[in-house]
Regions:
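Transmembrane helical cores of multi-pass secondary ion antiporters/exchangers
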Residues: 1-354
Length: 354
């Protein structure tokens, strides 16, 4: 996330901001909504008629939807060049960056509300209420989730911005141009500090680091020597690529650790269908609104390029896999295995043909 923010081509990002924010913000929320509806429908449809048990609790369907709202456009971006497909490249890259940030915030907002609901339910059981009770999120909880989402977003962005401005000021005052290695070290160190500060104050460390990267690229970048500029960019990109490579290797190896006793195949099939269906809405709804807002002018992308956008958004990669591992709900093993299988199927089944 930091590398994406630090190396972001701001001119292209701003020029196509309506498409990027439409797909990255509104599209992600639409995808989560559609996924939640389909998963809840499947959860009730395949409920055991004898025991009355379902795959997971209704609230966990929303948590799973928040995780699977994440997209991974890496496979598509490797096939197109920025020179030949300038708009398409900018839209896909921008959507990927914004989608990652929004997905993480949605996941954290839903997870916090579920933890509160679970705590209240467990407290009721201790007081003598009947055994297991489905965890659901009503209007009050959903309202709290929305407030939490915006509150967490704003505070995390401010935290990252403050750290980014601080390192910019430090580099300007102390003027370390004579030592590019120290400049690069300070840049990377403060980027990680923005993550630590946010995590210690119950904010989103990843969003804080993303915000820090944007401010460092805009301010701190110009307060360091030319050698440090090149070195810092190469360092963060190398670290990011290594991390992503190791994560994909781990994802591949994790296929052998899937616990089949916690896999509901009907749930997996329903989830995969939901991923394909939700992408239609997460692309169609934002683009239709952008088209209306521009006075129904022709779109900047051709129909075949929109097919690339659709296909790129079908893959569930590093963010979805990472968030899936963090789940701590009662049925977390079922959810984790479902995310693992969906990630592997979309990477191999969609990414490989692309």
């Amino acid at each position: 996330m930091f590398a994406s923010a630090y190396t972001l081509k701001k001119k292209n990002f701003v020029r196509h901001i309506s498409y990027i924010l439409g797909l990255g913000v509104l599209g992600t929320i639409v995808a989560m909504t559609v996924l939640t509806l389909i998963l809840n429908y499947g959860n009730e449809l395949y409920r055991d008629p004898v025991t009355g048990e379902s795959w997971v609790d209704p609230a966990e369907c929303m948590l799973l939807a928040a995780v699977l709202a994440s997209t991974d456009t890496v496979a598509v971006l490797t096939l197109i060049t920025a020179d030949k497909y300038l708009v398409l490249n900018a839209v896909l890259f921008g959507e990927g960056v914004v989608n990652d940030a929004v997905t993480i915030l949605l996941y954290q907002a839903v997870d916090r509300e579920i933890q509160k609901a679970e705590a209240a339910t467990n407290h009721g059981i201790e007081d003598g209420a009947p055994g297991h009770k489905d965890i659901t999120l009503g209007r009050k909880e959903i309202s709290g989730m929305i407030i939490n989402f915006f509150s967490l977003s704003i505070r995390s962005i401010i935290m990252g911005a403050l750290v980014g401005l601080l390192v910019s000021y430090v580099l300007k005052v102390f003027n370390l141009n004579y030592d590019p290695i120290k400049e690069t070290t300070i840049m990377i160190m403060f980027a990680y500090l923005s993550y630590l500060f946010a995590e210690q104050t119950a904010l989103s460390g990843i969003i804080s680091m993303f915000s820090c990267g944007l401010f460092m690229a805009h301010y701190a970048y110009w307060n360091i020597s030319k050698k440090a500029r090149v070195g810092t960019e190469m360092a963060v990109c190398t670290i990011a690529n290594c991390n992503q490579s190791f994560l994909y290797i781990y994802m591949g190896l994790s296929a052998f650790s899937i616990e089949m006793e916690y896999v509901h195949m009907n749930m997996v099939y329903t989830t995969l269908i939901a991923i394909f269906v939700c992408r239609i809405f997460s692309v169609g709804v934002p683009i239709f609104l952008v088209w209306l807002s521009t006075g129904m002018k022709p779109l900047q992308l051709k129909w075949n390029e929109w097919v690339f956008v659709y296909c790129g958004g079908l893959i569930r990669g590093a963010i979805a896999f990472g968030l899936g591992l963090q789940m701590t709900t009662d049925n977390n093993k079922v959810l984790k295995n479902t995310v693992q299988i969906c990630a592997l199927v979309t990477i191999v089944g969609v990414g490989a043909p692309i």
